[in-house]
Design a protein with these regions (language model features):
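Extreme N-terminus nucleophile/cap motif
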Residues: 2-61, 75
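A basic- and aromatic-enriched beta-loop-alpha substructure that forms the phosphate/nucleotide-
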Residues: 59-80
Length: 80
C-alpha cells in the first residue's frame, strides 16, 4: 500500500474580493511542492500565466500579481 497522496490546491479569487496571504501561499506550496502556477487577465484583456518550480519566486510573483491585478481581474493560483 502506498503513502499519502496530496491533491492539487487551486485558489480561485474573483476580482476585487481580496487576496491570498503570504502565509497561505507558503502553506499551499509546502503541502504541494511539485510546481506552481498563477493566471490572470492583463490590462490588454489577455490571459497571462506564470509557472515556477521555485517557491520563494512563486510566492513573490503571486503577491505582486494580486497587488497589481486583483481589483480588476479574476486570479487563479495552483500548487501541485
Amino acid at each position: 500500500m502506498g503513502g499519502i497522496s496530496n491533491m492539487c490546491i487551486i485558489a480561485s479569487i474573483p476580482k476585487n474580493t481580496g487576496t491570498i496571504t503570504k502565509n497561505t501561499l507558503e502553506t499551499m506550496c509546502n503541502n504541494n511542492s511539485h510546481g506552481f502556477g498563477i493566471a490572470w487577465i492583463d490590462e490588454n484583456n489577455k490571459i497571462q500565466i506564470s509557472k515556477s518550480m521555485d517557491q520563494k519566486q512563486f510566492v513573490k510573483k503571486c503577491l505582486k500579481v494580486q497587488n497589481d491585478y486583483g481589483k480588476k481581474s479574476d486570479i487563479l493560483i495552483h500548487a501541485r
